[in-house]
């Protein structure tokens, strides 16, 4: 296996990305916990253009960004009224700091769309409703994007309290107006989508929805506003007014269509991380190879491991490939064992410092106001009794950490990771290191 092929291809991709950076939504935080770079996020697949703006306001890219009609394999679970934070980066892989160029001034908004499948829905078309927006703040004399820069790229909102449970696409949007005064005008949109499952017993469905693309066009005043020579009239946000719980909604408990929609989203059944996932990178996960005690078994395991490595690199998003490189190191160890006559394995996976394993980093941000806003994040570590409360997603005998009290879920799975779904809390759950059942 010539590993340099992976390295050369990635260097070429990331070098081209550095040439022209704007911004891209890379990471979803749920209640201040990072779900991992690229995890549950629809984002552009080409690193060289991932941060480029959407200039065609009539294109399907307006829904969830470039390549946004294709879903990813993971869906992140969120609870009722959860705080969602969307991280924007000027460089998708965080190779350099920055959220967006200070010159790119303009408004922000967050939309949601209830869907039958967060993975399979194309996102294009009707059903989108706005839950928050902010344009120019007269009190601070700053545009929303300027606040975003001040807060290291974090934009945070609370999910409306009465939204019906089920699958949703959550869509943060930035609009840069620095070239809106040109001829022809060049408003620049930056957006992406997070695939989420809302665990809620509430029943409200917003009735005031719009089409994306379609809610705004090149003739809309909101995209032609001259920020360098502002008119006397205040800026008007694009799209509908934000949804207000209990006011602009209907119940989903009436009507055959609503009843059917409610029935098959009563419990999350797609996009879950398998219990046997050993390492993740964005929406990919590696499954440990079968145990072996013979030379043939060793080489079979090596082949399986390298095949998974190829898939990981092939589907790695512009946010990077840290988990792939960690998995690659595991495959190298297996291969060297086979070559050296060590036919018992596989060896224990060695996780390198800072690798994107389980894609879960406990990161705490200041509490979000009910109307949303932009906030910076900081980290925290807590411990209880003789066991430390897990902040990296790992638990069990090997590391002395419990999931009890963890932001990542209170159940410790059979393979030693924290979570809250049946895969973590059911068969094999380690009761000594968390809650089961």
Swiss-Prot record:
<dbReference type="InterPro" id="IPR036861">
    <property type="entry name" value="Endochitinase-like_sf"/>
</dbReference>
<feature type="disulfide bond">
    <location>
        <begin position="411"/>
        <end position="425"/>
    </location>
</feature>
<feature type="binding site">
    <location>
        <position position="178"/>
    </location>
    <ligand>
        <name>O2</name>
    </ligand>
</feature>
<feature type="glycosylation site" description="N-linked (GlcNAc...) asparagine">
    <location>
        <position position="79"/>
    </location>
</feature>
<feature type="domain" description="Chitin-binding type-1">
    <location>
        <begin position="392"/>
        <end position="437"/>
    </location>
</feature>
<keyword id="KW-0732">Signal</keyword>
<dbReference type="InterPro" id="IPR049892">
    <property type="entry name" value="AA9"/>
</dbReference>
<keyword id="KW-0136">Cellulose degradation</keyword>
<feature type="glycosylation site" description="N-linked (GlcNAc...) asparagine">
    <location>
        <position position="67"/>
    </location>
</feature>
<keyword id="KW-0147">Chitin-binding</keyword>
<feature type="disulfide bond">
    <location>
        <begin position="429"/>
        <end position="436"/>
    </location>
</feature>
<comment type="function">
    <text>Lytic polysaccharide monooxygenase (LPMO) that depolymerizes crystalline and amorphous polysaccharides via the oxidation of scissile alpha- or beta-(1-4)-glycosidic bonds, yielding C1 and C4 oxidation products. Catalysis by LPMOs requires the reduction of the active-site copper from Cu(II) to Cu(I) by a reducing agent and H(2)O(2) or O(2) as a cosubstrate.</text>
</comment>
<dbReference type="GO" id="GO:0005576">
    <property type="term" value="C:extracellular region"/>
</dbReference>
<feature type="binding site">
    <location>
        <position position="22"/>
    </location>
    <ligand>
        <name>Cu(2+)</name>
    </ligand>
</feature>
<keyword id="KW-0325">Glycoprotein</keyword>
<feature type="disulfide bond">
    <location>
        <begin position="64"/>
        <end position="193"/>
    </location>
</feature>
<feature type="disulfide bond">
    <location>
        <begin position="395"/>
        <end position="412"/>
    </location>
</feature>
<comment type="similarity">
    <text>Belongs to the polysaccharide monooxygenase AA9 family.</text>
</comment>
<dbReference type="GO" id="GO:0008061">
    <property type="term" value="F:chitin binding"/>
</dbReference>
<dbReference type="InterPro" id="IPR005103">
    <property type="entry name" value="AA9_LPMO"/>
</dbReference>
<feature type="binding site">
    <location>
        <position position="190"/>
    </location>
    <ligand>
        <name>Cu(2+)</name>
    </ligand>
</feature>
<feature type="glycosylation site" description="N-linked (GlcNAc...) asparagine">
    <location>
        <position position="252"/>
    </location>
</feature>
<dbReference type="GO" id="GO:0046872">
    <property type="term" value="F:metal ion binding"/>
</dbReference>
<feature type="signal peptide">
    <location>
        <begin position="1"/>
        <end position="21"/>
    </location>
</feature>
<feature type="glycosylation site" description="N-linked (GlcNAc...) asparagine">
    <location>
        <position position="120"/>
    </location>
</feature>
<keyword id="KW-1015">Disulfide bond</keyword>
<dbReference type="GO" id="GO:0030245">
    <property type="term" value="P:cellulose catabolic process"/>
</dbReference>
<feature type="glycosylation site" description="N-linked (GlcNAc...) asparagine">
    <location>
        <position position="307"/>
    </location>
</feature>
<keyword id="KW-0964">Secreted</keyword>
<protein>
    <recommendedName>
        <fullName>AA9 family lytic polysaccharide monooxygenase H</fullName>
        <ecNumber>1.14.99.56</ecNumber>
    </recommendedName>
</protein>
<dbReference type="InterPro" id="IPR001002">
    <property type="entry name" value="Chitin-bd_1"/>
</dbReference>
<keyword id="KW-0503">Monooxygenase</keyword>
<keyword id="KW-0624">Polysaccharide degradation</keyword>
<keyword id="KW-0479">Metal-binding</keyword>
<feature type="disulfide bond">
    <location>
        <begin position="403"/>
        <end position="418"/>
    </location>
</feature>
<keyword id="KW-0560">Oxidoreductase</keyword>
<dbReference type="GO" id="GO:0004497">
    <property type="term" value="F:monooxygenase activity"/>
</dbReference>
<keyword id="KW-0186">Copper</keyword>
<feature type="binding site">
    <location>
        <position position="188"/>
    </location>
    <ligand>
        <name>O2</name>
    </ligand>
</feature>
<feature type="binding site">
    <location>
        <position position="104"/>
    </location>
    <ligand>
        <name>Cu(2+)</name>
    </ligand>
</feature>
<dbReference type="Pfam" id="PF03443">
    <property type="entry name" value="AA9"/>
</dbReference>
<keyword id="KW-0119">Carbohydrate metabolism</keyword>
């Amino acid at each position: 296996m010539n590993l340099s092929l992976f390295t050369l291809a990635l260097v070429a991709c990331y070098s081209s990305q550095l040439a022209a950076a704007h911004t891209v939504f890379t990471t979803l935080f749920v209640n201040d916990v990072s779900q991992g770079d690229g995890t549950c996020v629809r984002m552009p697949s080409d690193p060289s253009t991932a941060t480029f703006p959407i200039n065609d306001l009539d294109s399907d890219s307006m829904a969830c960004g470039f390549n946004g009609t294709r879903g990813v394999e993971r869906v992140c679970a969120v609870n009722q009224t959860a705080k969602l934070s969307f991280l924007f980066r000027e460089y998708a892989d965080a190779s350099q700091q920055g959220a967006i160029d200070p010159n790119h001034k303009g408004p922000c908004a967050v939309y949601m769309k209830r869907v039958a499948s967060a993975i399979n829905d194309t996102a294009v078309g009707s059903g989108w409703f706005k839950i928050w927006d902010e344009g120019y703040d007269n009190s601070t004399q700053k545009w929303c994007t300027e606040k975003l820069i001040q807060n290291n790229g974090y934009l945070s909102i609370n999910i409306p309290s009465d939204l019906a449970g089920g699958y949703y696409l959550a869509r943060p949007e930035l609009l840069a107006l620095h070239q809106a005064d040109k001829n022809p005008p060049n408003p620049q949109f930056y957006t992406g989508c997070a695939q989420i499952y809302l665990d809620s017993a509430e029943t409200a469905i917003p009735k005031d929805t719009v089409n994306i693309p379609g809610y705004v066009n090149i003739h809309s005043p909101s995209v032609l506003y001259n920020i360098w020579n502002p008119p006397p009239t205040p800026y008007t946000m694009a799209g509908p007014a934000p949804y207000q719980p209990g006011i602009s909604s209907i119940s989903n408990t009436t009507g055959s269509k609503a009843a059917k929609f409610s029935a098959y989203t009563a419990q999350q059944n797609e996009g879950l991380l398998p219990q046997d996932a050993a390492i993740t990178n964005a929406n990919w996960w590696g499954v440990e190879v079968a145990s072996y005690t013979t030379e043939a078994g060793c080489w079979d395991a090596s082949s399986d491991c390298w095949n998974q490595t190829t898939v990981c690199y092939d589907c790695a998003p512009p946010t990077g490939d840290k988990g792939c490189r960690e998995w690659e190191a595991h495959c190298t160890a297996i291969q060297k064992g086979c070559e050296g006559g060590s036919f018992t394995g596989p060896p224990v996976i060695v996780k390198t410092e800072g690798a994107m394993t389980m894609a879960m980093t406990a990161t705490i941000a200041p509490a979000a106001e009910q109307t949303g806003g932009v906030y910076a994040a900081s980290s925290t570590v807590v411990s209880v009794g003789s066991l430390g409360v897990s902040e990296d997603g790992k638990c069990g005998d090997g590391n002395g950490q419990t999931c009890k009290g963890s932001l990542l879920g209170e159940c410790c799975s059979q393979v030693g990771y924290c979570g809250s779904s049946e895969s973590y809390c059911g068969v094999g759950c380690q009761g000594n290191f968390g809650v089961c059942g």
